[in-house]
Amino acid sequence: MKVVLATQSPRRHELFSGLDIPFTIRLIEGIDESYPGGLPVHQIPQYIAERKALAYQSSLAEDEVVLTADTVVIVGDKVLGKPHSPEEAKAMLHELSGREHQVSTGVALMGAEGRGTSFVATTRVWFAPLSEEQIDYYLRSYHPYDKAGAYGIQEWIGYVAIEKIEGSFYNVMGLPVHLVYQTLQKWQVCKKNFVPLPIVIVDNK
């Protein structure tokens, strides 16, 4: 089994490296990451991860398996992705300040024949109230514009603002590595037990 890690995220590269499983990085530009408007919020990252995996199918060798992921921050029923501007990042942090939110990461695993699996892991996170000065300092010093919800739990803001979490810390960073490891172990034992993707079926009626 040869793992293809299909992500440009340095955090996911770092996390997967910690599993001591050899991998190569492969990137395809321009994958459509949109999702249907009626999709339940917690299924969104799983749906997007599956779309990413399916885009790699034709490039996979018989002994390769591609791993894709997508992370979103959920506040109430609102989804926060990556901010597109400093103003949007600031608005996101104001929205997270002093309240609970959820971080959901969807992961998809697929071989060349189209068989695979996908799942979503969710972690609950509680933020302390953030002052205007703290938000401005974080944005100015850490530029978190490549992160869902405009923050990285492993950075300064995680030390000073996160009161508690419930679930996987690494999931908040972008990859639930314990579940990834368990799934890859099952794949090595018998990949024929896996089913064709997609698993998240959208009813367009």
Positions of PLM-derived features:
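N-terminal polybasic phosphate/anion-binding patch
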Residues: M1-V65, K78, E133, H178-L179, ...
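Residue-level signal for inorganic ion chemistry
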Residues: F16, A49, D70, A89, ...
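Mobile beta-alpha loop/short-helix "lid" or hinge segments that flank ligand
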Residues: D20-E33, G106-G114, D146-G158
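Active-site-adjacent loop/tail segments of enzyme domains
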Residues: I44, T71-H101, P129
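Short beta-strand-to-turn element immediately C-terminal to the catalytic PLP-Schiff-base lysine
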Residues: I74, A108-G111, A128, I162
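Anionic-ligand binding region
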Residues: K90-H94, T105-V125
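Active-site oxyanion/phosphate-handling segment shared across diverse enzymes
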Residues: S118, T122-K191
